[in-house]
């Protein structure tokens, strides 16, 4: 998924798999072409796409390079969300985005973060409300900033895709707050 500076979804990146890894490619489609069916992991996400010739040039699917960069193929003013590093406003790294949870209204509700270092014994996965995430310009691209402090991150419950989702939210005064997200587990995109 890519988002703009306001956090609005713009494109969804789809991995088209080839045969035994040969022919794999990633293609980005405009967000407005997708329909989300409420119901969770086993419900389909539908790509409602007319013939390419009927689409405006800006709405046509685009091939995306298969590189390790989270910004590869992102349009100017947009940021690829999955695998993006998330920082605090002071530049300290918080973690890495591993998933985005989409609500019934087809809007991002929460971001799933892998927090802690690779060898950190406190490494875990948490969900943070989408409202805690901001996007700020940096070096001609966008960076993801999280408005949560250490206490909020440590107090946040672990994320489990098969359990009710408790997403940590920014709270006045810096007190930890976990609020149920309206997204369903498994609404991975």
Briefly describe each language-model feature range.
Residues 1-189:
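Peripheral interaction segments used for macromolecular assembly
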């Amino acid at each position: 998924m890519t988002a703009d500076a306001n956090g609005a979804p713009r494109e969804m990146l789809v991995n088209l798999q080839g045969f035994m890894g040969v022919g794999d490619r990633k293609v980005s489609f405009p967000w407005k072409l997708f329909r989300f069916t409420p119901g969770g992991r086993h419900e389909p996400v539908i790509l409602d796409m007319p013939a390419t010739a009927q689409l405006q040039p800006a709405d046509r699917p685009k091939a995306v390079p298969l590189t390790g960069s989270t910004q590869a193929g992102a349009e100017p003013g947009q940021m690829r969300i999955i695998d993006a590093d998330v920082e605090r406003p002071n530049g300290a790294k918080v973690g890495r985005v591993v998933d985005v949870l989409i609500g019934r209204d087809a809007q991002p509700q929460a971001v799933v973060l892998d927090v802690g270092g690779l060898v950190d014994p406190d490494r875990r996965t948490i969900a943070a409300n989408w409202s805690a995430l901001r996007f700020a310009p940096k070096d001609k691209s966008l960076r993801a900033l999280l408005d949560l402090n250490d206490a909020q991150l440590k107090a946040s419950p672990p994320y489990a895709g098969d359990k009710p989702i408790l997403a940590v939210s920014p709270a006045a005064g810096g007190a930890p707050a976990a609020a149920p997200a309206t997204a369903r587990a498994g609404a991975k995109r």
